[in-house]
């Protein structure tokens, strides 16, 4: 698995961001049964930048904690068999499945960790697990989908032994 990691801005999280991100992405992909080596882009930024991205790409005029930009349109969440005939979903040089981009606000990680009464590490890991589910076709437009996604997030966090 390849993680392309970039960090911008002055806010720092009190943890090893790149190493933890790689661990969470690998665990989440294993959990959903991704049979391919994959690549993910992760950008850690601040509220002003994620606000602009949220406004531009989603039409929502406020900062958010995490944005996910999947590169693949899945017919069903967490299904990968259709990809064998989708050469454009794989990096031509590495052969890895190109899942997409994750953007996280470091300020939101710190604020939400405090608000929810857990560590910044737990909040950061949760947001990455949440986003990887989006990158593999999961969403929560309907209540049933939300329940499925929440259960999967909990199980990934339990497998990582990163609890509240």
Which residues fall in each region the model found?
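An acidic/histidine-cluster motif and surrounding catalytic segment
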Residues: 1-125, 135-164
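A glycine-rich beta-strand to alpha-helix segment
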Residues: 128
């Amino acid at each position: 698995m390849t993680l392309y990691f970039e960090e911008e801005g002055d806010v720092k999280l009190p943890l090893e961001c790149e190493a933890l991100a790689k661990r969470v992405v690998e665990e989440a992909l294993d959990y959903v049964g991704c049979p391919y080596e994959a690549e993910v882009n992760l950008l850690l930024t601040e509220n002003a930048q994620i606000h602009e991205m949220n406004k531009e790409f989603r039409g929502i005029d406020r900062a958010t904690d995490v944005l996910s930009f999947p590169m693949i349109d899945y017919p069903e969440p967490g299904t990968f068999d259709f990809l064998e005939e989708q050469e454009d979903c794989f990096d031509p040089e590495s052969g890895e499945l190109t899942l997409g981009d994750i953007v996280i606000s470091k300020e939101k990680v710190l604020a939400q960790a405090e608000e929810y009464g857990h560590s910044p590490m737990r909040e950061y890991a949760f947001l990455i697990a949440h986003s990887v589910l989006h990158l593999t076709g999961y969403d929560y437009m309907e209540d049933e989908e939300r329940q499925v996604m929440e259960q999967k997030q909990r199980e990934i966090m339990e497998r990582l032994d990163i609890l509240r």
